[in-house]
C-alpha cells in the first residue's frame, strides 16, 4: 500500500472501542443476542463494542449487580494482525498491526512493534523492542538489533520509506531515518543514527553514521546469522 491508501484507510475506517466485560447478576433477564457472551445465569464474560455495553447496562442495570471492564484501545482505526497467517516465529508481546507482510522463517522477538504497511522478507530477525515504522521495507536474511528504530513514513505523506536490502545487520539501538536506503550486505554500528543512504557492503557507525570500511571476511565472520534460530520445527 502507498501512503495515500493507508491515510485514506485510517481516516475512513470505523473507529473501534472493543471491551471485555465481566458481569455478575441476574443475567438470565439480560438479552445478549447482539453481542458475544459466555457464561451462565449469574456470571459471564462479554465481548462487545463500548456503545453496545452502554445500551445493555442502561436497559438491564437492575439485573447487573457488578461489572469490570478491560480495555486495550480507544477509537482504534486499524486492528492488530491475525498472527495465524504468518509462517514465522512470533514471540509473546510483539505488536503487529494489520496489513504487515512478514516472510517465511522470520523471527519477531518480544516487544517488537511493526506498523501498518511494513514489509519484512524471508528469514529476517526483528529483535527485542525494535520499532518498524509504517511502510518500511526490510529485505531477506537481515538482523535488526534490539531497540533499533526504522522510521515510518505515514506522516508526512510525501516522505519515502526506508529500504533495507538483503543481508543487512543493524546494531542495537541504531536509528535509520525516513527515506534512507541501506545497501545489501551492509552493517550499521550499534547506536548509530543513519541520515543518508549506505552503499552495499559498507560498515557505517556514529552519530550521524559515517563510512568506516567495506565489509571484509573478518567482519562477515563476526556478524553471521544463525540458521537454527529461524527453524520453525
From Swiss-Prot:
Annotated catalysed reactions: (S)-2,3,4,5-tetrahydrodipicolinate + acetyl-CoA + H2O = L-2-acetamido-6-oxoheptanedioate + CoA
InterPro entries the record matches: DapH, DapH_N, Hexapep, Hexapep_transf_CS, Trans_hexapeptide_repeat, Trimer_LpxA-like_sf
Domain of life, per lineage: Bacteria
GO molecular function: tetrahydrodipicolinate N-acetyltransferase activity
Pathway: Amino-acid biosynthesis; L-lysine biosynthesis via DAP pathway; LL-2,6-diaminopimelate from (S)-tetrahydrodipicolinate (acetylase route): step 1/3
Disulfide bonds: none
PROSITE patterns documented for this protein: HEXAPEP_TRANSFERASES
Entry annotated with the keyword Amino-acid biosynthesis: yes
Top-rank EC class of the record's enzyme: transferase
Glycoprotein is among the record's keywords: no
Keywords: Acyltransferase, Amino-acid biosynthesis, Diaminopimelate biosynthesis, Lysine biosynthesis, Repeat, Transferase
Gene Ontology terms: biological process: diaminopimelate biosynthetic process; lysine biosynthetic process via diaminopimelate
PANTHER family reported in the protein's UniProt record: 2,3,4,5-TETRAHYDROPYRIDINE-2,6-DICARBOXYLATE N-ACETYLTRANSFERASE, ACETYLTRANSFERASE
NCBIfam families: DapD_Ac (TIGR03532)
Family as reported in the entry's similarity comment: Belongs to the transferase hexapeptide repeat family. DapH subfamily.
Protein name from the UniProt record: 2,3,4,5-tetrahydropyridine-2,6-dicarboxylate N-acetyltransferase
